[in-house]
Each structure stands twice: as C-alpha cells, then as structure tokens.
C-alpha cells in the first residue's frame, strides 16, 4: 500500500484520468474530491462491500432457482 501525506488543497494523480484532492480537514474527517471519467465507478468502501455481497447473494439464488427449474422440467 502506498501511503501519502497531503495537506488541504493538495492532490494526488492516479494515471492520466483520476485526481484526488483534499478539499477540507475537519476534526477526524477528511473531505476528498475525486475527478474521474464518468465511466469509472466510485463508491465508499462500505457501499461497495454491500453491493458485492448483494450481487453474490443474488447469484446464489439465481443458481438455486435454475437448478430447481431444471429438476422440475425433467
């Protein structure tokens, strides 16, 4: 993991298309601004984990439903 120190209004560049800027520092919170192409999905980590878990659960349900339908058509 790369660890960087940035002050307010400073930024980091990821590749050619993504820039992350420190907008504000308020107590224990840091506000970040992210400039990226619209084709890049950006989520808070906890939201991304929830989406991934829900997709995995849906895939299991779909697989079970498909197996059920196959067994009942035979």
UniProtKB/Swiss-Prot annotation:
Report one GO cellular component.
Answer: cytosol
List the Gene3D superfamilies hit by this protein, alphabetically: Translational regulator CsrA
**What molecular functions are annotated in GO for this chain?**
mRNA 5'-UTR binding
Q: Which Pfam families match?
A: CsrA
SUPFAM superfamilies linked to this entry: CsrA-like
Family to which the UniProt record says this protein belongs: Belongs to the CsrA/RsmA family.
Q: What does this protein do?
A: A translational regulator that binds mRNA to regulate translation initiation and/or mRNA stability. Usually binds in the 5'-UTR at or near the Shine-Dalgarno sequence preventing ribosome-binding, thus repressing translation. Its main target seems to be the major flagellin gene, while its function is anatagonized by FliW.
Please name the PANTHER family in this protein's record.
CARBON STORAGE REGULATOR (PTHR34984:SF1)
Q: Which NCBIfam families match?
A: csrA, PRK01712.1
Q: Can you say what this protein is called?
A: Translational regulator CsrA
Q: Which gene encodes it?
A: csrA
């Amino acid at each position: 993991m790369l660890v960087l120190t940035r002050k307010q209004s400073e930024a980091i560049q990821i590749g050619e298309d993504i820039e992350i800027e420190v907008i504000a520092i308020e107590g224990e919170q840091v506000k970040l601004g992210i400039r990226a192409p619209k084709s890049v999905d950006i989520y808070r980590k906890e939201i991304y984990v929830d989406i991934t878990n829900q997709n995995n659960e849906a895939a299991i349900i779909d697989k079970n439903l498909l197996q059920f339908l196959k067994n009942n058509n035979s």
